[in-house]
Amino acid sequence: NTIETAAPVIRDRHMTVQPQPHMVRDVTQVAHAAKLRDHEIIDARAAARFRGEAPEPRQGLRAGHIPGSKNLPFTQLLNGDHTMKTIPEMAGEFQKAGVDLSKPAITTCGSGVTAAVLSLALERIGKKDHSLYDGSWTEWGQFPTLNVATGDS
């Protein structure tokens, strides 16, 4: 590898942002999907947090996960050097987590950040019908009217 020492050339670029509302879900949509079980809800948090065995880093949140969701910690999609695994390896991780890729997917995590790693992996393996719940556990875990599951399922 060569390290360049020259100053970078900075150029103006134009980019037009196209909103993609179908790629984001809110708490009402996720609650509906959890009730109907017509989507795969995939949680990127560590297994202990998903199972409700580890305390939540945000005060006042219940421990556990969205009922019916599957756990695939985002770190399982990464190599030791923090690059993403190969497409076949990532597809295998979704399969090992019990994710039914024939259903539309909703990714979630603690606050909507690491769920994006799951969404990127889904996109890379060719799955187009996925969305991200950006409220994630920070939102779900604070509402006493929403059910919470613990354990592996």
What are these regions (language model features)?
Residues N1-E40, A44-S153:
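Rhodanese-like catalytic fold shared by cysteine-dependent sulfurtransferases
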